[in-house]
């Protein structure tokens, strides 16, 4: 029996994780800036999350949301402290792509419109609806026709927003485009986008699967822009490593949803609720958001200073602990070098090395990663010159 390999094989067998580190089968420790593409933001085997999951597993692990359970009440109280502004309702699902699907369906029902606006270079998932609003033709074209009509506008281009009209059901946007290269939205662009959706009666969906729950140095990345979306999707970090996603909705939208409008066999299971409850408690108890903000600024400053003289480095960008190092060639060799030296990172776009560390990283971790990255870039640069 073989597992279908849908992601590139890194050639490592990982057997354990703890805080900001993982260990391979030979006992070697790695500094984890991959974190399951941003999932383990709260650290591997976080003790609070472990405790909640163990306790819930000993009681009941699966239950339809037709039934109530004590962990649901505790989760709702915990979520109430971290919820996006004006969003008092949550729908629990299992993955980021499912949350996007639910958000798109909700927008169509609420507005009675069909057209969806997304942005070039966006990534929202690989199921039919979310794939329809994902830009990369490599992912999308083999499976067309998909859900439509969808129109892609140019990210950070205010003039292009004129194409949002009274037939638009929703505009879906990542505050920082992650998969395409860690590209933050401009403040002016986001404010213009919010104004345009309000004027046309379109719903503004923020896909915060990767940016949300403290990763960018704000609890939610929309807070960088002083606007509030109509719908927000969260995932990855919000489960502390457990597969769960959340769609947050305000009352005026949630109250129009009816039984059967959406559903999920596993969505909102007691284990997922326990994970979300625990993750919310970690965020509050450990002052995670402020740590991500301070450490993110510190790490970016270290990288900028250490890489400033390298011609192969175009830019260091991002927010908080979502950092991209844009280089002048494909990053495969650099990622391999980092891994050989005990640091796991991930590619973004065609030329970006993406660092998505846990909030638990230390100054020493930052220095080590920056120095190893510099060594790797110099080694590859010198090799290219000599050849």
From Swiss-Prot:
Entry EC number(s): 2.6.1.118, 2.6.1.124
Cofactor note (record): Binds 1 pyridoxal phosphate per subunit.
Keywords, alphabetical: Amino-acid biosynthesis, Aminotransferase, Arginine biosynthesis, Cytoplasm, Lysine biosynthesis, Pyridoxal phosphate, Transferase
Subcellular location: Cytoplasm
Family matches, as Gene3D superfamilies: Aspartate Aminotransferase, domain 1, Type I PLP-dependent aspartate aminotransferase-like (Major domain)
Cofactor: pyridoxal 5'-phosphate
Keyword Transmembrane appears in the UniProt entry: no
Keyword Transferase set for record: yes
Reaction it catalyzes: [amino-group carrier protein]-C-terminal-gamma-(L-lysyl)-L-glutamate + 2-oxoglutarate = [amino-group carrier protein]-C-terminal-N-(1-carboxy-5-oxopentan-1-yl)-L-glutamine + L-glutamate; [amino-group carrier protein]-C-terminal-gamma-(L-ornithyl)-L-glutamate + 2-oxoglutarate = [amino-group carrier protein]-C-terminal-gamma-(L-glutamyl-5-semialdehyde)-L-glutamate + L-glutamate
One Gene Ontology term of the molecular function aspect: pyridoxal phosphate binding
PANTHER family: ACETYLORNITHINE AMINOTRANSFERASE, MITOCHONDRIAL, AMINOTRANSFERASE CLASS III
Assembly: Homodimer.
Stated role: Involved in both the arginine and lysine biosynthetic pathways.
Protein's recorded name: [LysW]-aminoadipate semialdehyde/glutamate semialdehyde transaminase
Gene name of the encoded protein: lysJ
């Amino acid at each position: 029996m073989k597992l279908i390999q849908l992601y590139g094989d890194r050639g490592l067998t990982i057997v354990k994780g703890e805080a900001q580190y993982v260990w391979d089968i030979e006992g070697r420790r790695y500094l984890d800036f991959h974190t399951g593409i941003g999932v383990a933001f709260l650290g591997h085997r976080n003790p609070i999350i472990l405790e909640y999951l163990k306790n819930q597993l000993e009681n009941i692990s699966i239950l339809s949301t037709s039934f109530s359970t004590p962990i649901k009440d505790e989760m709702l109280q915990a979520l109430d402290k971290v919820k996006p502004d004006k969003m008092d309702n949550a729908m629990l699902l299992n993955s980021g792509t499912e949350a996007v699907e639910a958000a798109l369906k909700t927008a169509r029902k609420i507005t009675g419109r069909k057209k969806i606006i997304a942005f070039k270079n966006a990534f929202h998932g690989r199921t039919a609806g979310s794939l329809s609003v994902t830009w990369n033709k490599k992912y999308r074209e083999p499976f067309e026709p998909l859900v439509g009509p969808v129109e892609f506008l140019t990210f950070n281009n205010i003039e292009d927003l004129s194409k949002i009209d009274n037939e638009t059901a929703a505009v879906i946007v990542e505050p920082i485009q992650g998969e395409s290269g860690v590209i933050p939205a401009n403040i002016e662009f986001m404010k213009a986008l919010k104004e345009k959706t309000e004027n046309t009666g379109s719903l503004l969906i923020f896909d915060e699967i990767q940016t949300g729950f403290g990763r960018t140095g704000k609890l939610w990345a929309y807070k960088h822009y002083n606007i509030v979306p109509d719908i927000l999707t969260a995932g990855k970090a919000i489960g502390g490593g457990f597969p769960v996603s959340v769609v947050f909705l305000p009352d005026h939208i949630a109250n129009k949803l009816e039984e059967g409008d959406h559903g999920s066999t596993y969505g909102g299971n007691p284990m997922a609720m326990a994970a979300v409850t625990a993750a919310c408690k970690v965020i509050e108890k450990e002052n995670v958001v402020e740590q991500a903000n301070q450490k993110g600024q510190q790490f970016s400053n270290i990288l900028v200073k250490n890489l400033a003289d390298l011609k192969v480095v175009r830019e260091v960008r991002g927010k908080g602990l979502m950092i991209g190092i844009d280089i002048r060639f494909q990053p495969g060799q650099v990622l391999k070098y980092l891994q050989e030296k005990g640091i796991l990172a991930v590619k973004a776009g065609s030329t970006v090395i993406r660092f998505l560390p846990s909030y638990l990283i230390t100054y020493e971790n930052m220095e080590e990663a920056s120095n190893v990255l510099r060594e790797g870039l110099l080694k590859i640069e010198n090799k290219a010159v000599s050849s």
